[in-house]
């Protein structure tokens, strides 16, 4: 029969792992989101600054009227959902800047006139794709650090 030494101590460490891991992962997710948001703000075309100022991240769902880049959900807990977004009631045109518009005929006050369309000025998904790999790396590092911290008794 095999006897495991210090089983109670190991059990205590394993029980502490989820809380320590959650804090480390949350910190890593915040750092990754801040990097992505900073890149988005540097790439967005600026007229009056409303669109640039509307870019951000939040825990949970994006504010109403905004365009969400991605919602990153942790497999550990449902409360670790981080959403990166752009646009709000004032900067409602975020998706038009990101994807552009096609040529169309105006209606309303300027009915019958032609709008030439606008070219896409991507800032949103470009930033997400450029930082996706490093963000995952940061989160994995957070998990490793949490396991290491629990193992050393920290």
Region locations from a protein language model:
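Short, Lys/Arg-rich flexible segments
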Residues: 1-94, 99-154
């Amino acid at each position: 029969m095999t006897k495991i030494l210090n089983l109670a101590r190991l059990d205590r460490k394993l029980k502490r792992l989820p809380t320590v891991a959650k804090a480390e992962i949350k910190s890593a997710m915040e750092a990754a989101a801040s990097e992505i948001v900073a890149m988005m703000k540097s790439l967005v075309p600026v007229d009056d600054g409303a669109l640039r100022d509307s870019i951000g991240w939040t825990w949970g769902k994006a504010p109403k009227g905004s365009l969400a880049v991605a919602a990153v959900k942790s497999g550990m807990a449902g409360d670790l959902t981080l959403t990166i977004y752009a646009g709000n009631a004032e900067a409602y045109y975020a998706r038009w800047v990101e994807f552009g518009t096609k040529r169309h005929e105006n209606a309303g006050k300027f009915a019958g006139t032609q709008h030439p369309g606008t070219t896409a000025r991507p800032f949103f998904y470009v930033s997400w794709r450029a930082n996706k790999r490093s963000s995952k790396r940061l989160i994995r590092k957070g998990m490793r650090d949490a396991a290491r911290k629990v193992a050393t008794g920290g």
